């Protein structure tokens, strides 16, 4: 399984023509631990410029940076056009955005040391390399970035990981009653073992959905090999998550293997758990009741989003961003956020409308036309739109199937299938009485258990930031899901949404409050961890 995930998740390669220009190559390692590769055409001058390539995601089985980083799918073309080209392996694998801007700063400094200062810089990036490229531009650590070409970029940033988290939650809810169909780990943040975990993962998919055998056989016969129950569960997962069957194995693999790697890496999230769904409506009444609910500390969510969420502060850089229309790994909805953030005069988006889903399944001429359109724009030509890029592509290839950019394509509203709303209405009222220092909680749900509780938290005599539990009352579930107070036993954390401080008036703020539960010598107490203001 891991081999398939890696092969698909790595960025696609274009077939490029051979060139015969002589180049000088430099390879080495910077102080961050990242490897670099630089190629420079003979007689290169500063005015010829530099292209920096940012590669895509590398899976959890690749634990060390690549000592011979790729220069990208258009490297030969760029060299033939006179550009020098450089790439970093990055000092981290996986979601490498935590330190990639520093890695690329050192790459650029190494280029200046070995070759000279370029008058202009272009950045190209694919898949994860798209958000890496935006961080490069917004950090300002590389000067003179005049243009950027992004292929199927994860440009909405870290929030893309919520789709992986939601897929796992939905999969587990659909498959929970299927014997032997449990995923390799009980908790979404636990890292499965390399071999046993992969076998258990494939076995889970086969038992629940029949996907593995049916995909191996393929076609109508493959579909017939699935039982009616497997078909029903498979279609339900696909309908709710809105992904194509061809992406289910890959995307669920990211959720089960790559997401825990991100969470547990000591130089990334270091065990912090930023993923939540306490307020998420999955659009299916039964799934809403079955799905495991989780809350996340605001500081944990913030650390994830800081690595990285684009701001739109790109200076004078011009960007051409292309995407395939049916990409369900990095959804085309990523382009919506880019469009909302960046001035229209600096951004051209073109979507290749495809018959079969793919991640970055561009033709060579589509990539080349986007690149040459960007170069012309940077050199003083008119800003290209999708139709211009399509026309450029068709000039180079009479096969119209190799040029699929559609000016009329409408972008989805979001990169997220299930957007987060931390101010969603709640079942029950949570309040803090400032006169008595008492917290009253209504409809507290213990994750994974039936029923809810009404209770009060009374401050300890020794420490008014520590609370004891009193007046606990069990109440039967209402039969439908609503956003409510939540206790997470595995994290020993209590989540209190939309808490009011009494006396409370209509325009007063509400707070999402997070507390830590302890039971020492039979004394149950809660300590305040964090809080955030809601916007309702």
Annotate the PLM regions.
Residues 45-46, 107-127, 144:
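Gly/Ser-rich "nucleophile elbow"/oxyanion-hole loop immediately N-terminal to the catalytic nucleophile
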Residues 206-208, 225-256, 345, 355-424, ...:
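Alpha/beta-hydrolase-fold serine-hydrolase catalytic core, especially in secreted/extracellular enzymes
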Residues 120-176:
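Primarily recognizes the serine-hydrolase "nucleophile elbow" in alpha/beta-hydrolase
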Residues 154-309:
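Accessory cap/linker subdomain of secreted extracellular hydrolases
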Residues 320-323:
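Short beta-strand/loop motif that positions the catalytic acidic residue
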Residues 22-44, 292:
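N-terminal cap/lid segment of alpha/beta-hydrolase-fold proteins
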Residues 47-57:
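Short beta-strand element of the alpha/beta-hydrolase
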Residues 329-333:
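Conserved alpha/beta-hydrolase "acid-adjacent" motif
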